[in-house]
Regions:
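Conserved beta-strand signature within the Rossmann-like core of class I S-adenosyl-L-methionine
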Residues: 359-371
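A short acidic, Gly/Pro-enriched loop at the edge of an enzyme's catalytic core
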Residues: 320-333, 427
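Conserved class I S-adenosyl-L-methionine
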Residues: 225-238, 245, 253-258
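Core SAM-dependent methyltransferase catalytic element
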Residues: 390-391, 406-440
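Conserved Class I S-adenosyl-L-methionine
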Residues: 281, 285-286, 368-369, 373-404, ...
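N-terminal accessory segments
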Residues: 2-226, 230
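S-adenosyl-L-methionine
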Residues: 271-326
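A short glycine-rich, Lys/Arg-flanked "PGG" loop and its adjoining helix->strand segment in the class I
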Residues: 346-359
Length: 440
């Protein structure tokens, strides 16, 4: 899971124990639920909190086969039990969503304690002019609203993966005994990714990247001389919007892949809805910085549930191993904000080359923001040289994908934001590098 640079900077500044974002060993990568209070507790809408069925349209042989494989991999007796086991990582993600309110209330309590250090005269001014205590109380109310959404996400995931409450409670109790806290940041980043992938507000960030990728795929489809759909793989797919856009083009058999269980249970939540409905989240209440007006921080964003494309298949797990046995299988691999998440960049390149058919194409769009412990960190010119040496041939892309980065080289640069909050008083953008290469 890619986290925002601001979140990463905050985590690094706070010390080595603050960054609890889910990582992996071989790679860094309905209606609005109603709520009310009863006796000071959150009363949950039973309709909103009930079990939500998976999309019945997704009943193709490949979906059924992958679900069977997934449940086999999820069995605690399958493979070695450790913190990298998919069931353990799933329980950790459910732990995180379970403790959303607790972790965020702890931070709010810290803000309230800090406010007590303000002098009486200063506090009187703050209360009169901006009603600062009410501001903190409003944040608490929105934490409770977000908790309802988190519980809906969790309920859907527990049904999909067949996890019962007793097993989750045992995992949480063990974590508590070991002194481990739930991962606050990964849950927060997942809520923000709902904005980037599915909310109207995320359209600006999507529109800076998607047109280049989609038009490139359209041109590849046009030159395809068979009626069979082109097999496309999108690793590091997050909450899946790009994969669904590719499927909507027609003529593609789309497979998306994601390691992060936080992202995967978020995707399952989106995918469980087959009607045009929506849920509202308040994703920006976990930080006080960079807000022009307080209502920007408090605003709710609607996440629409338009009917998902039933042909998209999610394969969970590590990109480098999830597709073992599928050598020379895919016509196209699309890496969108992905390759720099690698622990071992060369392993990603090897996997891309291994999975592509001879003559298959790799489309890349993204930055080179390496994580905290990569085995190798290459500059762009080094990447181009390595990729060519591995047996890839660069082909030019349209000007829609940006200007040429190097004279005489078929790689382009396009500015692309990655910040989630379009109203923030800060901007984080990259000169994303775009290329199209063919396996020769």
């Amino acid at each position: 899971m890619r986290i925002s640079p601001l979140a990463l900077l905050f985590a690094v500044a706070c010390g080595p124990f603050s960054l609890a974002v889910e990582t992996k060993n071989d790679a860094p990568t309905t209606h609005e639920a109603s709520f009310q209070y009863e006796n000071g507790q959150l009363a949950q809408d039973p309709l909103a909190m009930g079990s939500m069925p998976s999309n019945d349209l997704q009943d193709s042989p490949r979906h059924r086969q992958e679900k069977a494989h997934l449940m086999k991999r999820m069995d605690s007796k399958h493979g070695k039990w450790s913190s990298t086991h998919p069931r353990y990582r799933l329980l950790e993600a459910l732990f995180g969503f379970t403790k959303y309110r607790e972790r965020n209330m702890a931070e709010l309590d810290r803000w309230r304690k800090l406010y007590k250090n303000v002098g009486k005269k200063q506090k009187k001014t703050l209360e009169k002019v901006v009603d600062y205590t009410k501001k903190l109380d409003d944040i608490e109310e929105l934490i409770y609203k977000n908790e309802v959404v988190c519980k809906s996400i969790m309920t859907n995931a527990m049904q999909f993966y067949n996890i019962d409450q007793e097993e989750l409670n045992e995992h949480i109790n063990k974590a508590t005994q070991d002194g481990r806290q739930a991962d606050k940041m990964s849950v927060s980043q997942t809520l923000k990714h709902f904005v980037r992938d599915w909310a109207d507000e995320g359209s600006k960030e999507r529109n800076e990247a998607f047109p280049c990728i989609l038009s490139t795929l359209e041109s590849l489809k046009t030159s395809h001389d068979s009626d069979a759909p082109l097999k496309v793989l999108l690793p590091g797919s997050g909450l899946g919007r790009l994969g669904h856009e590719v499927a909507t083009l027609g003529g593609f058999e789309v497979t998306v892949n994601e390691w992060s269980m936080y992202m995967n249970i978020g995707y399952r939540f989106i995918d469980a809805h087959t009607t045009e409905d929506q849920v509202t989240i308040h994703p920006f209440i976990d930080g006080m910085s960079h807000h022009a007006i307080t209502s920007d921080m408090f605003r709710g964003l609607s996440i629409p549930f338009s009917s998902p494309n039933p042909e998209v298949l999610l394969v969970e797990g590590d990109f480098n191993s999830a597709f073992n046995g599928q050598e020379d299988h895919f016509d196209i691999i699309v890496t969108h904000f992905f390759i720099d998440t690698a622990r071992n960049l060369m392993a990603y390149f090897d996997t891309i080359h291994r999975l592509l058919k001879p003559g298959g194409t790799w489309v890349n769009f993204g930055p080179l923001l390496y994580g905290t412990g990569p085995f190798v960190q290459l500059s762009l010119d080094e990447i181009l040289a390595v990729v060519e040496d591995m047996g890839f041939e660069f082909e030019d892309m349209s000007e829609e994908c940006g200007e040429l980065t190097f004279e005489g080289k078929k790689v382009r640069s396009k500015q692309s934001e990655y910040g989630f909050n379009r109203k923030a008083l800060t901007r984080n953008a990259y000169l994303a590098q775009t290329w199209l290469v063919r396996k020769v």
